[in-house]
Amino acid sequence: MKKNNILIFYVLAFLQGLIFYSSVCTLYRTDCGISLTQMGLIDGVLCICVILFEVPWGLICDRIGYRKTIVISNGFFFLSKLAFYKATTFWGFVIERVLLGIASSGLSGCDTALLYLSVPKEKAIGTFGRMSMFGTLGMCCASLSFSLFFSHNLRGAALWTAIMHFASFVISFFLVDVKEEKKEQETKNSLLQTALTCKKMLPVLIASLLLTESMHTLTTYYNQLQYESVGIPVQWFGILFMIMNLVSLSTGLLDTITQRIQRDHFMMMLFVMAAVLSIGIIFTHSAILSVVIFECMVCAESMTYALMNDIQNESIDGTPRASTLSLYSLFQHLGMFFTGVSFGVAADHSLTAAYGLSAVFCVVGLISYIFWYKNRSMLVKKEEKESNP
């Protein structure tokens, strides 16, 4: 077990969560004369860059190693934050998004793969949960710091964000690479095996995508509309955002939870919980209950992300890890386009329709997850019979 890697990843997660301007990123851009339409185009550039660079980064990572890939990606991450600080025009922010896309696609799967290989398999879930917890803690500290120090100095918030990301770039040099098992190296160029692995994982990737995107959309875009409809004053939104981030710290309890409840059974419980919450918010007219429901949604989303990191890494046996994880991520980014458009159409009709669509997605996700779980269980039993005739 590479204990130094674990501690370094916790520090990196915290530092990269310190985005001091996150709560005013829209205002920051509008102050530079960027319109909302231009912001949409800028975010589209990010999405395109992530899709374009995802698989190439996976291939590069399998060739040069996890540590070097993370160091290079964190270098681009720092440059993206520096570009954001310096940007004053549309093209300046486009450059920032391109750099961020390169960094995000490089880190995607690579950091979790190295972390997974740095701990015993039975401790992976808890480690992923704590890593997510430290990232959330960083976001909470950033939100508080903005209110205390940067509320009248947006440029200062961007500068200190860049400084924190430079620190994470430097710290990433202290990571130690972990070599893959020999059998994985022997099939490093096996595109067929990689494709077969992705095909087997398709149902669970669809399932997790439907749950996480449903919860993310509701808690990021539609919660404010719900708060207004139940009479919560706008000045409370910042505090509720802080509480929502704190709820994400619950991922630190995953190790304890999965010791008592089998991982896949707990995942199924999260799907049921998400569907019930989506239906419940339709009939909710209470301010307190609305807040509680959205906090529970954040909890379900955060825990699903952490558990999926374990499931995805566990599925890789005999294929190049980074390339396979990149293909998983590529599929999910493509799926995000579908869910985003679907929620947009539903929300244009009514908020109730968007909540109902979320419930449908979660039920479909549950069915897809159960299908994957049963197929995997049958495959495991078959392999056990063949190995013990």
Residues of each region from the PLM?
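Helix-loop boundary and gating motifs at the non-cytosolic
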Residues: 1-52, 200-242
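Cytoplasmic helix-loop-helix junction between adjacent transmembrane helices
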Residues: 98-136
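C-terminal ends and interior cores of transmembrane alpha-helices
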Residues: 75-88, 272-285
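Helix-loop junctions on the cytosolic side of multi-pass membrane transporters
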Residues: 161-164, 169-185, 371-383
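Transmembrane alpha-helix termini and helix-breaking/packing motifs in multi-pass membrane transporters
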Residues: 140-159, 228-230, 256, 337-355
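Juxtamembrane intracellular "pre-TM" segments in multi-pass secondary transporters
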Residues: 1-3, 176-206
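Paired small-residue
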Residues: 91-99, 288-296
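Helix-to-loop junctions at the C-terminal end of transmembrane segments
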Residues: 54-65, 150, 250-263, 347
